Amino acid sequence: CIGGFFLPFAKELGHPMPAFDFTLDSVNSISVDLHKYGYANRGVSTLLLRDVELMAYHRFSWDDWPAGRYTTTAIAGSRNAGALASAWAVMRYLGCAGYRERVAKILAVKERMIESINAINELTVWGEPHGGHFSFGSEQIDIFAVSDGMAELGWLSGLGTEPKSMILILNAQ
């Protein structure tokens, strides 16, 4: 849900990106959720396989059912297709250009936010974030207290515990 509809477009836009896809020989499958940066409702995911032969390992079959054998290649069973229709409509509406535009906006804001956070001596951005999210914390101040204070002002964030951090997932308007 975090990288599948973000990292490929960031890579297209020329942002330095470690290999994460089928360019790595060891990657045989990629799961991509369509919510968050795919902008679809929850409940739709994709599974990309390097080789069609791998599909044989993604079947579910159950013989002990009164109606007979039940076999499916999806774990969704007989759920309705509303989320799927939503995802299709959003993808058709945005197209690659729409996703690229949103990723470009998010990356620009993320860069400014990281620069601003790094300008505060007591704060540290953890790692080298490549996606539209990042975490930051402090070894000098209680970052959870900072998060609580920001929440009172309407700024909500996720929290991480190892190391203690605030997690920001950015989005384009």
Locations of regions flagged by a protein language model:
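Catalytic nucleophile loop
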Residues: 1-4
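Active-site C-terminal subdomain of aminotransferase-like
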Residues: 8-132, 136-141
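Glycine-rich, often proline-containing surface loops adjacent to acidic residues and nearby aromatics
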Residues: 87, 166-167
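A short linear hydrophobic-aromatic micro-motif
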Residues: 121-124, 155-159
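Short amphipathic alpha-helices in soluble, non-transmembrane regions
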Residues: 146-153
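PLP-dependent enzyme catalytic core of the Aspartate aminotransferase-like
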Residues: 169-173
